[in-house]
């Protein structure tokens, strides 16, 4: 809650949230290219924010992707600094275009990167995970039996516009009403 109050809500996608935040700070390149679709050379950019999301540039609340840095990246960086160990992260390239791009660039182990990291599950698919759990009878969190496909930050709205019904927030209301109320109602 403190991170959202300080930085803003994570909406649409990390990339869209970053563009919106930078445009609100007055970044002329982002305003020109992402809001109006004009590159610095005057040509049209195909990476313009869609008209559907342009209204968020003037939304009455803060928008940011900083929650990911605050809740995930900074703690991992601190851990690596304090212990000298490389974090092992369980993300898969199939989860997003950005993760796929990074995996194609570095593979599973990016030990030579500015912030070294190991991602041994990068090439796995979700079906591989479930096959492994069944084959080796590995216990897993029961939340996956409640209709959840992913876990993560409960406030996260990244990709929520793509959710089928019941959406993540509708499921949260049904399975964890107190947490849903904290997320949705206790701010009023």
Set out the residue ranges of the language-model regions.
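ATP-dependent adenylation/nucleotidyltransferase module used to activate substrates
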Residues: 1-128, 135
């Amino acid at each position: 809650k403190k991170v959202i109050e300080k930085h803003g809500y994570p909406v649409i996608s990390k990339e869209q949230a970053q563009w919106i935040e930078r445009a609100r700070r007055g970044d002329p390149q982002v305003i020109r290219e992402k809001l109006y679709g004009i590159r610095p050379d005057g040509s049209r950019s195909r990476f313009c924010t869609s008209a559907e999301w342009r209204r968020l540039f003037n939304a009455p609340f803060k928008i940011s992707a900083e929650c990911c840095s605050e809740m995930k990246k900074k703690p991992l960086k601190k851990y690596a600094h304090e212990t000298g160990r490389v974090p092992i992260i369980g993300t898969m390239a199939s989860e997003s275009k950005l993760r796929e791009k990074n995996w194609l660039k570095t593979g599973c182990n990016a030990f030579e990167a500015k912030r070294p990291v190991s991602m041994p599950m990068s090439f796995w698919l979700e079906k591989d995970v479930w096959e492994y759990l069944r084959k080796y009878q590995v216990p897993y969190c029961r939340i996956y039996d409640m209709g959840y496909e992913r876990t993560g930050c409960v406030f996260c709205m990244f990709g929520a516009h793509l959710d089928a019904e019941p959406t993540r927030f509708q499921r949260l209301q049904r399975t964890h009403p107190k947490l849903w109320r904290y997320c949705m109602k206790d701010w009023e």
